[in-house]
Amino acid sequence: MSRDIFMKRLRLHLLFDEVAMVTHIVGDVLSSVLLCAVVLLVLVGNTLVVAAVATSRKLRTVTNVFIVNLACADLLLGVLVLPFSAVNEIKDVWIFGHVWCQVWLAVDVWLCTASILNLCCISLDRYLAITRPIRYPGLMSAKRAKTLVAGVWLFSFVICCPPLIGWNDGGDGIMDYNGTTATPIPVTTTQTPVTGRDDVLCDNGFNYSTNSNMNTTCTYSGDSSLSTTCELTNSRGYRIYAALGSFFIPMLVMVFFYLQIYRAAVKTISAYAKGELKTKYSVRENGSKTNSVTLRIHRGGRGPSTGSSVYRHGSTYGGSAAGAATREGCGDKDAAGGRRFGRQEMDSHLPVRKCRSSDASLVTLTGLKCEIIDNGNAKHGPISELIKGRGKSFFWRKEKKRSVGGERESFENSTRNGRSTRAKLCGGRCLAIETDICSSGECSPRTKRIKEHARATQHNSLPVTPSLSSQNEETDAVFVRGTSNSEYKPRRSRLSAHKPGHAMRLHMQKFNREKKAAKTLAIIVGAFIMCWMPFFTIYLVGAFCENCISPIVFSVAFWLGYCNSAMNPCVYALFSRDFRFAFRKLLTCSCKAWSKNRSFRPQTSDVPAIQLHCATQDDAKSSSDIGPTASGGNGGYT
């Protein structure tokens, strides 16, 4: 009878063992598939990022220096750390020896910290690009970017090296970067089961045997010399040091930079909303039709926007100005007060660089008032009084533009009722000049050639490239439409001016690209916090409470941090058109042909050229060709 009971218990015990074994196998298979998928995503995704930048010159920007460095850190993590972590997680025992345990853990923290600090550098780069667009090329040059990259790797090593030189919890085992100990596992252990049950299971990698006394003996089935486990040490000081240096301080830095980027975005949108004011009407003066000036101000600097007040006060006069025939030089002072101006002073006047001339007269347009210097005699007063009977001219200014080619100049000529207009960029800003070219109906041969050239080209616009670029260019620009009572209607060119709101739309399109980059940065930072916050929180809690965290929770948080290295390339592919295009080309094996067909364009090539024309409302549908000196290839000036 007792023997039958013993056999029933034995069969029940074997059934429980089989169920537990099947469950354990299924769990191992699912864990293996999931962990292998993470490892493959890290390897493939970051390899694509590095290959995309290597094969596309368009992607070789300063920002992408940090992105490539981030991808390299994650790629090395996928090669040197993750495969061993996956095996250790699945087998639940370290089988690669004591020495590699130490190296593996040190490399793990080094690469993880480098990945986190690279995200911090990307946030810094975007912060400078968006909040300081003019100074950005000087602040974040290629040399400084490489210096930051070197600093990332050096600081990461400083975080991982203290345990290697003795900062640990005093244990006898091998210390890793976090002070983990590699402890040998006993070859055999004896466990006493619960009374009446003999379903004790051994750890993974051990075999069990049950004797007649119902005691279970677990015996390691592998090489006893390799049976080690790498466990985190309880060195409280180092855990705090590593958690702050590897995660919490970089996280605060990234959050600060992103908040500043968000504030800059909101501020710029508000400035554009205030600057997009339009006045369209006409008045009768002495029986002739006079059109009002339409002025837009786009502000990109600090301080409150004053563009709208400038517009309201300066949009009621009809703007026409006569000027000098010969330009000899440019000054650095504004026309009204003889002093430099700030962006916040636009509500009082519209500054330009005064162009000195050797003869005739010079006109400088400054807000409500105009100054005419006629053969050395200066006259001040409203524009409508000073320009009566002088015909049509126009004025516009553009802040200095930094570009690869440096400062450029552009000229234009046009003919209005026997008068020639010639405009030239003056130190980055432009003043339109109008002069008489014929006297008593007689024109010199040179003058005739000028007139013929003017009629042939009929220039009435100057190309400019104002933008919100975070890389190279200033964002202040003022556009003024002049007035005329002439019947001049130049022919339209496909490169000429567009409708009044076109410039604003182009500005906003460029700014939308900047907002998209900021949104991508927000997603990257959010993914970073979501992935690493659980692990480092548990890591700190473990320093004060050893048994508060279950092994399963620790493993999930541990691998969630690794998932961040797999998510970064996915974010680039989803939100970056250039990276998405490069990935598609690489995956379709057409990288070589694509690289040959793609010509190099600097990062500012995305900025569209804006052609502005100067015409009355009667001529709203008219515009002219771009002059022979204007470059249509890059949206700039020759």
UniProtKB/Swiss-Prot annotation:
Cellular localization per UniProt: Cell membrane
Keywords in alphabetical order: Cell membrane, Disulfide bond, G-protein coupled receptor, Glycoprotein, Membrane, Receptor, Transducer, Transmembrane, Transmembrane helix
Position of the signal peptide: none
Primary location: membrane
Record topological domains on the Cytoplasmic side: 54-64, 125-147, 260-520, 576-638
Domain of life according to the entry: Eukaryota
Tissue spec. comment: Expressed in the central nervous system.
Disulfide-bonded cysteines: 101-230
Extracellular domain ranges by topology: 1-28, 88-102, 168-239, 546-551
Cellular component terms per the entry's GO annotation: plasma membrane; synapse
Transmembrane portions of the chain: 29-53, 65-87, 103-124, 148-167, 240-259, 521-545, 552-575
MF (Gene Ontology): G protein-coupled acetylcholine receptor activity
Annotated glycosylation sites: 178, 207, 215
Residue ranges of the region described as Disordered: 618-638
Bilayer topology annotation: Multi-pass membrane protein
Pfam family, one: 7tm_1
Matches recorded under SUPFAM superfamilies: Family A G protein-coupled receptor-like
Function of the molecule: G-protein coupled receptor for octopamine (OA), which is a neurotransmitter, neurohormone, and neuromodulator in invertebrates. Activation of this receptor by octopamine induces an increase in both inositol phosphates and cyclic AMP. The coupling to adenylyl cyclase seems to be less efficient than the coupling to phospholipase C. The rank order of potency for agonists is p-synephrine >= clonidine > p-octopamine = xylometazoline = phenylephrine = oxymetazoline > B-HT920 > serotonin = p-tyramine > epinephrine > norepinephrine > methoxamine = dopamine = histamine.
Family: Belongs to the G-protein coupled receptor 1 family.
Protein name: Octopamine receptor 1
